[in-house]
From Swiss-Prot:
Any one of the GO CC terms: extracellular region
UniProt name for this protein: Omega-hexatoxin-Ar1c
Pfam families noted in UniProt: Omega-toxin
Gene Ontology MF terms in the entry: calcium channel inhibitor activity; sodium channel regulator activity; toxin activity
Organism (species): Atrax robustus
Length: 78
């Protein structure tokens, strides 16, 4: 495997693992809202059984309260 092929393979792997998807933004030289939205996570990244984020749309299905290994009730993706 040459260097170029290795770099391409690493970029593809990083994209798949991170579920990163580019979002269209306008140029913002002030560091405002557009600068913060260059990348966003795909809504299908969080698999079943993982903790729910604040925005439930990031779960693959829905969120429900479940008991974790410490007997605490937490929200998990279904």
């Amino acid at each position: 495997m040459n260097t170029a092929t290795g770099v391409i393979a690493l970029l593809v792997l990083a994209t798949v693992i991170g579920c990163i998807e580019a979002e269209d933004t306008r140029a913002d030289l002030q560091g405002g809202e557009a600068a913060e939205k260059v990348f966003r996570r795909s809504p299908t990244c969080i698999p079943s059984g993982q903790p729910c984020p604040y925005n439930e749309n990031y779960c693959s299905q829905s969120c429900t309260f479940k008991e974790n290994e410490n007997a605490n009730t937490v929200k998990r993706c279904d």
